[in-house]
Structures are given as C-alpha cells and as structure tokens.
Regions:
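Active-site catalytic loop in hydrolytic enzyme cores
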Residues: 89-160, 173-175, 179-181, 238-252
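Extreme N-terminal starter segment of soluble prokaryotic enzymes
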Residues: 1-6
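CN hydrolase (nitrilase-like) catalytic-core segments centered on the catalytic cysteine
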Residues: 64-80, 149-231
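Short, acidic/polar
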Residues: 18-29, 148-155
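Structural motif
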Residues: 36-37, 140, 163-164
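Short polar catalytic/cofactor-binding loops
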Residues: 8-13
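Cys-nucleophile CN-hydrolase/nitrilase-fold catalytic domain and related Cys-dependent amidase chemistry
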Residues: 16, 24-103, 172-192
Length: 252
C-alpha cells in the first residue's frame, strides 16, 4: 500500500522554532495513519514573509531542523518542508527552498525554479528544471507554488519518470480556481498523480484558500480539504484503487 499526504499547516510568521513544533505534531499524527510521505506548503517553516527571508535562511544541518530530520528517521516517513535557503551564487538573494528529509536520514534540497512576479525582489530562482527523488518508493518530482503555473515544469517531471508531482504552495482564494484546474490537468493529461499542500491560514498578506488536494492519474480528485484550517489530506492506494480522507490536525 502507498500512503501520502499534504500537511495543510498554519505558520507563525518568522518563528521557526514554533513552526518546527507544529510540524512535528503533524508528522506524528501522520505516522499514526501510516503516511509514508508528508509534504508541507511553500515556506511552511517561516510563513510567506518576504521581508524576513534573508534572516531566516536554513541549511539541513542547522540545529533547529534536527527534530524534523530525526522524526523522518524514527517514523520512516519522508518529509518535504518549505524554508528560505542559501542561493546558488554567493551574494545573491536567498532561494525559496524545499528541504527533503528522508526516512534514511539523508537530506536533499530543491530550489524553486520559477518565481512569482515580484518575488525577484527578495529571492533568487533555482536552476533545476526538474528534481525527482524516490520518496515513499515512488519517483516524485518536487514543485514550489509558481513552478506549477509553467506547464514545461510538469512536462519535465513526466519526462524524468515522475509518478507523483508534489507541490508546496501559497494559493489565495482568488487564485485557487485557476491553479487547481491546472493541477488537475496535469493529472489528466500527463497521467501523473498530483499532491498539493496549501497554507491553512493567511500568510504574508495572502488569504490562503486551504483546500489542499490530491488528484489521481487521469484527473479524478480523490480528496481535498474542505477549506482553511490545519489538517492532513491523506491519499492511499491499495490494489490499484485510491482512497482519501481528511484528518484534523492536533491542537497546538
């Protein structure tokens, strides 16, 4: 059986310590439901806070992230968390990163390839056209928010052999309809499964829509959060059939 989930989390602006603790609570809750891969939203560990990003850059070995790396090992669950990271070139603005903490203790980094208009004022873009890793036993391509608005990004994921297109996002109420139709289209037209984790509350001035979701290959939406709030959006496949459920996140 395969079991993956989007963590629809709520970030405390700029408070990495507090956000690590809330992430840990969601990881432990996901473990109780047999989740093998848990994906958090864009910049989940800091909130979407452009003016704070330069002071919140984190590397995989920073002590504040150690509890998450240990949780990945102890639960046997791969985690994808969002955080500002060092740029590729010294002196550049920080990149918008997704740290992957594997069940084997390894860490890997994906930098957001396509910036949203205006993000160039505080962030630098990555250069990887595709980043595919074996997570929960499945070739998984990572995406961060605006990456998903570029069809060539999803196509590159398919061409690289991805089974799952996993994206951490900041999607507002106003943008949700367009973005979700595009994600559904990738599942329908490219035959990949698509998992999207959105913030469950406002962040960085955006009234996030929540409604994190999963689409199976072919485009059927298996499960989606009904709205905002912290929750786990879980999709599982057994004997070729997908099922979904939404689990309320533990109180902090």
């Amino acid at each position: 059986m395969l079991c993956i989930a989007a963590a629809q989390s709520i970030s405390v602006p700029g408070d990495v310590q507090a956000n690590v603790q809330s992430h840990l609570s969601m990881v432990l809750a996901a473990a109780r439901h047999g989740v093998q891969l848990l994906v958090f939203p864009e910049l989940s560990l800091t909130g979407y806070e452009p003016t704070l990003a330069a002071g919140l850059v984190l590397g995989a070995d920073d002590a504040v992230l150690a509890p998450l790396r240990e949780a990945a090992r102890s639960t046997g669950m791969a985690l994808v968390v969002g955080v500002p990271v060092a740029p590729l070139a010294a002196g550049d603005k920080p990149a918008i990163g997704a740290w992957v903490f594997g069940a084997d203790g390894a860490a890997a980094l994906y930098r957001k390839r396509y910036l949203h208009p205006g993000e160039e004022q505080f962030a630098s873009a990555g250069v990887e056209d595709v980043h595919v890793r074996l997570l929960a036993g499945q070739p998984t391509a990572l995406a961060v928010c605006a990456d998903t608005t570029h069809p060539e990004h999803a196509r590159a994921a398919l061409d690289a052999g991805a089974f799952l297109y996993a994206c951490g996002s900041v999607i507002s109420e106003g943008g949700y309809a367009k973005d979700s139709v595009q994600l559904k289209g990738y599942a329908a037209d490219l035959g990949m499964s698509v998992l999207m984790a959105n913030h469950g509350a406002p962040t960085g001035g955006y009234a996030c829509a929540g409604r994190s979701a999963f689409w199976a290959p072919g485009g059927a939406q298996v499960v989606a959060a009904p709205g905002v709030g912290a929750c786990l959006v879980i999709a599982s496949r057994e004997d070729g059939a997908w099922q979904g459920r939404v689990v309320e996140a533990p109180a902090q």
